[in-house]
Amino acid sequence: MKQLLNPLKGNSDKIPVWFMRQAGRYLPEYKKIRETIKNFLDFCYDVNKATEVTLQPIRRYHFDAAIIFSDILVLPHALGWEVDFKENIGPILRQFRSQEDFKYLQSDTNNKLEKVYKIIKKVKKELPSTTSLIGFAGSPWTVMSYMLEGKGKQDFKTSKKFVYENKALSKELLNFLIDKTTYHLINQVESGANILKLFDSCSGVLAEEEFTEFVIEPTKKIILKVKEVLPKTPIIAFPKGAGLLYEKFIKEVPIDILAVDQMIPLEKMKEWSDKVIVQGNLDPVVLLTNKEIIKEKAYEILQVMEGKNFIFNLGHGILPETPIENVEFLTEYVRSFKK
């Protein structure tokens, strides 16, 4: 039995553990491979290298899940949108400004995403049978905000202003991304992923009305469409920074697993775990400290969530400067936890 799926099967005796960005720049073996390829998107499409870095943290830490090495921006890139990654800057994109910009988006991915699906198939063959494989995509609002801003996370004035002033056009772009995201997720499961995750990293910048329109409704549509085809596939949703709107999200979106950030009180996580499986929510910065602090902060979470429907994770991704021994210590502490 795959340990990560234990809460779904009503078995919460052992707490599953994996970490966002567990394959990444904090690992020396990752850095060694990253040095061999200049362009980040080429890296994401390289079947052998992306497979290897997906498996690296599993070999090192034996996490209960592997998450495929990819990026939320491979989808717009595969659809013809101009996306590039600049060193020490991050993603730079063609900026979506008007109806005319739809001409730069294609109706299909022209097989560009086939390499992602090949990576999943290859990882699946090499992954231990007890380890879950997570496929993922960026939620439509987050991908859309990158397209509207033309770059990585800013103050979101540009994207929010666009939405306020161009509601119909915004909905048209949103619906386009809903369809393509659904297609991408289904293909990942058909290639071998057995859990899916939707990352909505930018959801916390929206007021309630826009949060409902651009986060809740799109996520709900995607999940319902995926479940029509793949009713048994668990789906994780991560509306990062949603704050009080997490409550509304849980009530209205038919998710299996809710990932939460470190700002959410533990008692809320405990309360929500009666309705959904909760995943989170250690502050990634804690892993930059020492073993005593890591143990203290992990204990605070574990003693509240032990026996609940819970997956241990971080409130966001592992930071590049994280010491590898701290990740090992935390993982072993979670596995051996007893009150």
Curated annotation (Swiss-Prot):
Keywords: Cytoplasm, Decarboxylase, Lyase, Porphyrin biosynthesis
PROSITE patterns noted in UniProt: UROD_1, UROD_2
Annotated Gene Ontology cellular component terms: cytosol
Pfam families in UniProt: URO-D
Record-level GO BP terms: protoporphyrinogen IX biosynthetic process
Enzyme Commission number(s) from the entry: 4.1.1.37
PANTHER family xrefs: METHYLTETRAHYDROFOLATE:HOMOCYSTEINE METHYLTRANSFERASE RELATED (PTHR21091), UROPORPHYRINOGEN DECARBOXYLASE (PTHR21091:SF169)
Function according to Swiss-Prot or TrEMBL: Catalyzes the decarboxylation of four acetate groups of uroporphyrinogen-III to yield coproporphyrinogen-III.
Record protein name field: Uroporphyrinogen decarboxylase
